[in-house]
UniProtKB/Swiss-Prot annotation:
Disulfide bonds: none
Compositionally biased region (Basic and acidic residues): 354-363
Pfam families given in the database record: HAUS6_N
Gene name linked to the record: dgt6
Biased composition regions of type Polar residues, renumbered to the chain: 365-376
Name by which UniProt lists this protein: Augmin complex subunit dgt6
């Protein structure tokens, strides 16, 4: 058998299937297909049994034929096999109902058509059913059109007259159409000639000129050209007109102000001259401000305004910040006043504590009723026990000014004339030596240039060893030890010995001169403590380092310095303790001072000087600065002996 030859029945089946496909597509133009059926429609969909396509095609046709009947007879959509079997049985029953109702003479309605929907027989049956549905739809449409038109029954004569009129109208329409066609042909030729001319002028082919893209580009280019040539100049003219209108308004306002404030030429010249002098402007002539018509020149006025605008702006800015600066200064001054008041209160409290006498001073003042005893206020204030522990004071010195008649000779410090070089060591080892009798006293001749004659106090006093005085710093020295009385029976032998020890009988050495007191210049950068004009009590400050930052080193340095200076008994410029004036007066005026003067903290105390705690407090470096809050707990113990030169003679008993 030749497989290239197709059987005639298959060719007919294929032709019928294509015909069914075209009819379904025709129906889809008027009544769109559902989405599920649109996916299944094909020319060969029923060449083989296709149950899915059968269900969707019958659903589509039944709904077009009678939607109400379909809704009453069928259940849709199909969800399982049972509902699919019910749909097939309902389809057979509904087809039989349609066959009987419309006398369609469908003899091949059998169940196998719906059980195996495919093949030639099913395609032919489906073609007949689709034709029936189309006829029913046409009838329904004609019926609806007849109801809408409402055409009455017209006679044949009327219809003939209407037909004649329609023919004449059609004839005139044909003639008019021919004329329009000829005119359109002529215009088309003219357009072609113009396109040819444009193509020749522009060098662009006619096909490109006729292209829609080229026309769009040409239109855009033409729009840009119109904007550049017409729109932009117009906008610039509008802007210029607006600025001119604003300038005109300004000129009108200026003219109105000028009319209101019209001044004479002389007044304007005077005002401009004052402004020129005030702001240091260049010299301007009369012609620079006025033209022959008498009106002010705008450039000159603007120049003058520009000269003073900076100064005006600065002044306005200063005025704006004036209130702010005043508020700031006021706040600062209020804070300073509060701080000053607190400092004054603190200072007053401290001065009250410092000036308050102690119980011991009050008792000694009450016991001393004699007029010759004067209680001197110490230059350095008395502090509380906390402050007193931080300072080292020299021992009290008792000076008997009564003369001490008999064998009770007064006690005094050793002077230069009491010693010679070979007797210095013996004197250093002795603590107390009795004075020689009055008959054995011989004043040594001093330098005639000095002209000093010592009074009786020099020879009536006993000598205290300064080394012993330094050893009694921390001891109770309120009571002076009684000097040992010399034995009268041994005056014969011992008297000569004391005369020889003091060198009363020795002749004055030629060329010897008394050492005059020397003052040390004060230097702001001096490394010593600024306490005394003499160097005997000036303790050198030891720099704080890791090696010497101990209390032992500070104590040793201070003690060694004081001991070395105390042994310098040959210097009459100061006492061994450094607190007394030179015992040899300098001038004749000093000889009239009966009582010796004491120096407390670099101040000389006598009858004519009343101690004032505020005396020279600005330059006194020993005075406490009470402008700050004291915190004596922070004073280190390492500085106790560094301030040994700041000691105070607590008790002075005359």
């Amino acid at each position: 058998m030749d497989r290239t030859i197709i059987a005639p029945w298959k060719a007919e089946e294929k032709e019928q299937s294509e015909k069914l496909h075209r009819k379904l597509q025709g129906l889809a133009l008027v009544h769109p297909l559902p989405d599920e059926l649109r996916k299944l429609i094909a020319w060969d969909m029923f060449l083989k049994p296709n149950q899915v396509a059968f269900v969707h095609v019958m659903h589509y046709l039944f709904r077009l034929l009678d939607p109400a009947e379909f809704k009453r007879r069928f259940f849709w959509p199909i969800t399982d096999k049972k509902s699919e079997a019910n749909f097939r049985s309902s389809t057979v029953e509904y087809l039989k109902h349609l066959n009987e109702k419309h006398q369609l003479h469908w003899a091949n309605i059998k169940s196998y058509l719906v059980v195996m929907p495919g093949g030639m027989r099913f395609i032919n049956f489906l073609l007949e059913f689709v034709g029936f549905v189309i006829q029913e739809l046409i009838k329904q449409r004609e019926k609806s059109l007849g109801l809408e038109a409402g055409t009455p029954n017209v006679s044949a004569k009327v219809m003939a007259r209407q037909n004649a009129v329609m023919k004449e109208y059609a004839s005139s329409y044909v003639v008019n159409l021919e004329e329009n066609t000829a005119l359109l042909r002529d215009k088309t030729q003219k357009i072609r000639r113009l396109m040819a001319d444009l193509s020749a002028d522009m060098g662009v082919p006619e096909e490109q000129l006729a292209d829609d893209g080229f026309l769009d580009e040409f239109e855009a280019t033409a729009a840009l050209g119109v904007e550049r040539v017409i729109t932009q100049p117009t906008e610039r003219k509008f802007d210029l007109e607006a600025s001119l209108c604003g300038l005109k308004e300004a000129i009108d306002l200026f003219q109105v102000k000028q009319a209101e404030n019209n001044q004479s030429k002389e007044a304007v010249e005077k005002a401009l001259r004052g402004m020129r002098v005030l702001f240091d402007c260049d010299a301007v002539t009369e012609g620079d401000f006025y033209d022959p018509l008498g009106a002010s020149k705008m450039d000159a006025l603007l120049n003058g305004f520009n000269r003073i605008s900076g100064t005006i702006a600065e002044q306005l800015d200063a005025n704006d910040h004036y209130n702010e600066s005043n508020a700031f200064v006021t706040t600062d001054l209020q804070a300073l006043r509060v701080e000053l008041s607190q400092s004054e209160v603190q200072l007053n409290n401290l001065l009250k504590k410092l000036n308050e006498p102690s119980k011991k001073d009050k008792g000694s003042a009450n016991a001393s009723g004699s007029a010759r005893v004067q209680t001197l206020q110490p230059a350095t204030p008395r502090f509380e026990s906390v402050i007193s522990s931080k300072f080292v004071s020299t021992p009290p010195i008792r000076i008997d000014m009564g003369g001490g008649g008999g064998r009770n000779a007064p006690v005094r410090l050793a002077l230069q004339d009491d010693f010679n070089g070979k007797q210095f060591d013996a004197l250093s080892n002795s603590l107390l030596a009795p004075a020689p009798p009055r008959s054995a006293r011989k004043l040594k001749a001093l330098d005639q240039s000095t002209g000093i004659d010592l009074n009786g106090t020099l020879n009536r006093s006993k000598i205290n060893d300064p080394m012993q005085m330094l050893r009694t710093i921390h001891k109770n020295t309120s009571k002076v030890k009684a000097a040992p009385q010399a034995n009268l029976s041994s005056l014969g032998s011992k008297w000569k010995q004391m005369q020889a020890s003091f060198g009363f009988d020795e002749a004055p050495v030629p060329g010897a001169a008394v050492i005059s007191p020397q003052t040390s210049p004060t230097d702001p950068s001096d490394p010593f403590t600024p306490l005394s004009g003499s160097e005997c009590t000036r303790i050198e400050r030891i720099p704080r380092t890791s090696e010497n930052n101990t209390s032992l080193i500070a104590k040793s340095a201070a003690v060694i310095k004081v001991l070395e200076v105390s042994r310098n008994v040959l210097n009459l410029s100061t006492s061994p303790s450094g607190r007394l004036d030179a015992l040899v007066p300098h001038t004749e005026s000093h000889q009239q001072d009966v009582a010796p003067r004491l120096q407390l903290n670099d101040r000389t105390i006598n009858d004519s000087l009343q101690l004032d705690p505020d005396f020279n407090i600005e330059n006194d470096k020993n005075a406490f600065n009470v402008s700050h809050k004291f915190d004596f707990d922070q004073i280190g113990g390492e500085d106790d002996l560094q301030n040994i030169s700041d000691s105070v003679l607590k008790d002075i008993i005359f």
